[in-house]
Regions:
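Histidine-centered catalytic micro-motifs
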Residues: 9-21, 76, 162-171
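Active-site gating loops and adjacent loop-to-helix segments of metal-dependent hydrolytic enzymes
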Residues: 21-53, 177-195, 213, 223, ...
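Histidine-rich, glycine-flanked metal-binding segment
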Residues: 1-9
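Active-site mouth loops of central-metabolism enzymes
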Residues: 39-55, 106-117, 137-141
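Alpha-helical scaffold segments that flank or form the walls of functional sites
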Residues: 6-7, 24-75, 81-98, 121-127
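Active-site core of metal-dependent hydrolases
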Residues: 111-114, 127-235
Length: 341
């Protein structure tokens, strides 16, 4: 019954920021409001080189692989501060690690159009450099709805394979743009390409409003990505309710060793364990649902094909979901035999 658990194709990290990761311990973490740490991050980004980004991201990837991750989707900042250095580095890593892990890249509008209008042209240039998705953030511009519209228009113009939004990340009920995003996706019939990351405010709006929004999301065919480390500063979204509605939910590490989270080793079982504790995924079926979340490979067909072609399997000695989530054991990474025709 559980054979797929002890031997699988590997784990999926649905959301991270490899370009800004592994700054700690060289940079000493200091706790401060998010806006202050965002400013510090911009200062560091101005110092980034392509090789610096490559080296730090490589370190994170090697850790992920050690823990059994064979698929990762990473946001990469694109703005006048860092330019296209992160995209260039990640495209090189994508090729260098092609036989070990599938890396999907999302060109990310972290800073917004208001702060840096030049970002629009840089994002457009990034989208011509290789096959990648596009990423926005519902809270970085004064008019979040306009931000969503502009990002969706760019995604359509360049026919991107996926579009992601850091969605309502503050967790405040007044920052609730998820229904608008779902409405736009439904209207444009593109929800199967759209990923709503975090969705923290869904946890703080009234239950009736949340239920209506989840129904709208399901009708729009949106995907959701949950990052449990966000619990340090805000409520986690309604994961169980989203799963019950049949919405595809993936799990992401989010930040790793940066100025927003100095911890994070890329062990997806560890992140699943954290979510299990925080939201009480304790019943046997719920534990299996958690493992399904971290085994959810890429929905994009080309990425899924690349993932399928990896000659790698992740093997655990136990067949019990409870044991995996309780002890977070290290896997054995094995090379699958390739049968010649």
């Amino acid at each position: 019954m559980m054979s797929e658990i002890w031997k699988c194709k590997g784990f999926a990290n649905a959301h991270t920021h490899l370009d800004k990761g592994m700054l700690v311990p060289e940079v000493v973490y200091v706790d401060a409001p998010a806006s202050i740490r965002g400013g510090w991050t911009r200062e560091k980004k101005a110092e980034f080189t392509k090789m610096d980004i490559y080296d730090r991201a490589e370190k994170a990837l090697l850790q992920m692989i050690r823990y059994g991750t064979t698929y990762v989707r990473t946001h990469v900042d694109v703005d006048p501060v860092v330019g296209l250095k992160g995209i260039e580095a990640m495209l090189e890593l994508q090729q260098a690690f092609a036989k070990q892990i599938v890396i999907d890249i999302t060109a990310f509008n972290q800073e917004g159009f208001d702060r840096y209008p030049e970002t629009e042209k840089l994002l457009q240039e990034a989208l011509t450099m290789g096959r990648m998705g596009l990423g926005g953030h519902t809270l970085v511009d004064v008019d979040g709805k306009l931000h969503i519209r502009k990002m969706m228009a760019m995604a359509e113009q360049f026919d991107v394979p996926w579009l992601e939004f850091h969605t309502d990340e503050s967790g405040k009920p007044e920052d609730f743009l998820l229904p608008f995003l779902a409405e736009q996706a439904l209207e444009q019939e593109c929800g199967d390409k759209i990923y709503a990351i975090h969705c923290n405010s869904l946890a703080t709006v009234p239950d009736i409003k949340a239920a209506k929004t989840i129904e709208l999301m399901a009708n729009a065919k949106l995907h959701v990505t949950v990052c449990p480390t966000a619990v340090a500063t805000r409520p986690i979204t309604r994961t169980k309710e989203l799963l019950k509605a049949g919405i595809p939910v993936g799990l992401g590490s989010d930040n790793m060793g940066d100025l927003f989270n100095p911890l994070g080793g890329g062990n997806m079982l560890g992140y699943a364990q954290l979510l299990a504790y925080v939201q009480r995924f304790y019943e046997p079926e719920e534990q299996l649902a958690l493992l399904d979340m971290i085994r959810r490979g890429p929905a994009d067909l080309l990425s899924a094909s690349s993932h399928h072609e990896l000659n790698v399997s992740v093997v655990f000695e136990t067949q019990e979901a409870r044991e995996l989530l309780s002890h977070v054991p290290l896997p054995q990474i094995v090379q699958d035999k390739v049968c010649s025709a």
